[in-house]
UniProtKB/Swiss-Prot annotation:
Keyword Coiled coil attributed: no
UniProt-recorded name of the protein: Large ribosomal subunit protein uL3
Region (Disordered) residue spans: 324-346
GO BP: translation
SUBUNIT field: Part of the 50S ribosomal subunit. Forms a cluster with proteins L14 and L24e.
Gene name per UniProt: rpl3
Family of this protein: Belongs to the universal ribosomal protein uL3 family.
InterPro entries tied to this protein: L3_arc_euk, Ribosomal_L3_dom_3_arc_sf, Ribosomal_uL3, Ribosomal_uL3_arc, Ribosomal_uL3_CS, Transl_B-barrel_sf
Keywords for this protein: Ribonucleoprotein, Ribosomal protein, RNA-binding, rRNA-binding
Function: One of the primary rRNA binding proteins, it binds directly near the 3'-end of the 23S rRNA, where it nucleates assembly of the 50S subunit.
Length: 346
């Protein structure tokens, strides 16, 4: 008799498979980076195309022309609206104080309903000075940036997304000086990300509603004779007699998609500006003929990321520098691109 080997269907690592709390993904871990910069960026997924490039990664095809599918993420400038400072608490970092910029865009009130009233530049400078005193006294353990997106710049919508980003470096004073310089200003993707570096992509996947166990967990469709009882796309049984309950490990129907996911080590092929990519000294439009399906025209800055990423078109996508890069990684520079497909994706 042959070896009986039937591993369970589906991974329990992602259980419970339920909808994400928010469509704006969370980043709870940050890489260590010696460079003082904002550790990541955010944008909106436009669609996919493909390119031909000279492979510069270590491997059999190095130096040869290869086909690479890429995802385009439009990244209008982020606005730094605040600084959040943390102190060292008993169980880890605790919020110490925040400083918000005094002159915010009117659309921010659509997202933040509790904007401070009677808050002018004088009050802003006073709070900023108080925070600087805390930093100089050594009471602050970390400084991070509070930013919001500006989707109205690309004609997507009016309500922005707000989020927090860590700052690279080891010196808290250097982090504060960087935050002090950037507050109240726009940040573009080219200022904080480098072409060729590896990124982690964090997003909420496409929602697929309620699905059965075959599609949701990958269980086998039952043998045709077993289907004579009436159905075949279900599990054979719900488990043993004892323990006298249905265990949570049993693959059953339920919610599929709209899950919070992180995909590691996606290479940033190129960064474009104003919807255009510089190729061999010439500017070419990145938008394909007829526009990206369900999205339209890319008008602002964009990221060209290798491979696929989670989420549907127009969904908010967050990236950060790779937190666990491989030992053999490609050089941090733009690879030589020989062709970009602009054929219709309709």
């Amino acid at each position: 008799m042959g070896k009986i080997h039937r591993p369970r269907r589906g991974s329990l690592a992602y259980s419970p498979r339920k909808r994400a709390k928010s469509i704006v993904p969370r980043i709870r871990s940050w890489p260590k980076d010696s460079e003082v910069r904002m550790l990541g960026f955010a944008g909106y997924k436009a669609g996919m195309t493909h390119i031909l490039m000279i492979d510069d990664s270590p491997g059999l095809t190095k130096g040869k022309e290869i086909f690479v599918p890429v995802t385009i993420v439009e990244v209008p400038p982020l606005f730094v609206y605040g600084i959040r400072a943390y102190k060292q608490g008993y169980l880890g970092l605790e919020t110490a104080t925040e400083v918000w910029f005094h002159d915010l865009h009117k659309n921010v009130a659509r997202r933040i309903k509790t904007l401070p009233k009677n808050y002018n530049e004088e009050a802003f400078q006073a709070k900023l000075g108080q925070l600087e005193d805390l930093v100089n006294d050594g009471e602050i353990a970390d400084v991070r940036l509070l930013v919001h997106t500006q989707p109205w710049l690309i004609g997507l919508k009016k309500k922005p997304e707000v989020m927090e980003y860590a700052i690279g470096g080891d010196d808290v004073k250097a982090k504060f000086d960087y935050a002090k310089e950037k507050i109240g200003k726009e940040l573009r993707a080219g200022e904080v990300l480098h072409e060729g570096e590896l990124l982690d992509v964090i997003a909420v996947t496409k929602g697929k509603g309620t699905q059965g166990p075959v599609k949701r967990w990958g269980v086998k469709v039952q043998f045709h004779k077993a289907q004579r009882a009436g159905k075949g796309r279900h599990i054979g049984n719900l488990g043993p007699w004892h323990p006298a309950r249905v265990m949570w490990t049993v693959p059953q129907a339920g919610q599929m998609g709209f899950h919070h996911r992180t995909e590691f080590n996606k290479r940033l092929i190129a960064i474009g500006e104003n919807g255009k990519l510089v190729l061999d000294g010439n500017e070419i439009e990145i938008t394909p003929k007829g526009g990206f399906p369900h999205y339209g025209i890319v008008r602002s800055d964009f990221l060209m990321i290798e491979g696929t990423i989670p989420g549907s078109f127009k969904r908010i996508i967050r990236v950060r520098p790779a937190i666990r890069p491989p030992k053999k990684k490609p050089p941090v520079e733009r690879p030589q691109i020989t062709y970009v497909s602009r054929e219709s994706k309709q």
